[in-house]
Amino acid sequence: MSDIKSSTLELVGKTPIVNASRYAAKAGVTDATILVKLEAFNPAGSVKDRIAKAMIDDAEAKGALKAGSVIIEPTSGNTGIGLASVAAARGYRIIIVMPETMSVERRQLMKAYGAELVLTEGAKGMKGAIAKADELAKEIPNSFIPGQFVNPANPEVHKKTTGPEIWEDLDGKVDILVAGVGTGGTLSGVGGYLKSQNPNVKVVAVEPAGSPVLSKGTAGAHKIQGIGAGFVPDVLDTRVYDEIITVENQDAFATGRKIGHQEGVLVGISSG
């Protein structure tokens, strides 16, 4: 029987979970099982495909997006890639605004999907990109900013999909969730769902040591792309996490490489 999808967007979600047993063994972890959810299996390669599709679906349902609309989004990278993919599949023009410090590879991926890029001063971080996106939205008719940092559809899609997927795949045997905080949508949605199933689940938020906004209230420069926006996002539910840990740039780089070498899985800096 044929199984042909009408769009790549039907492939978003339902990603597999693997046991990082070799990494755990080499790290000396003997009292825990480390599991990794492979969000790279999404069509555009990251967990951000989920929120990209969710925010566009939500906007279309509410009439905020229609034929001829222009999508504008400030992003540090993967959300832009996800949105560029969704925009291409739905036929929208899209402009991505991002700090100039983000990797060239991410820029090339967005352009490959047909996105237009506007780069902002790196020192101004995501705040600078957000301000520029707002400026462009005022200048361009029929424009729409999904606003991943403030859009409730962001954590909601994780509450409806990512969280339940983890719970079901593990038969409810979840003790600890560890997630980096960029917008905070993944941690808030997944963590909130898991705690609704079992209040004893511990949720750990990860942020860059160079920009410990959640743990110390101070923002700064760092090299862990994808997390550490430099402010507390509106969609982050600070009641969900039980602990905050900070990670140094070099530790994130090194761990990401170790996972590739030891598990055969290529992950980004924020996963490291």
PLM segments and residue spans:
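PLP-dependent amino-acid enzyme catalytic core
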Residues: M1-G272
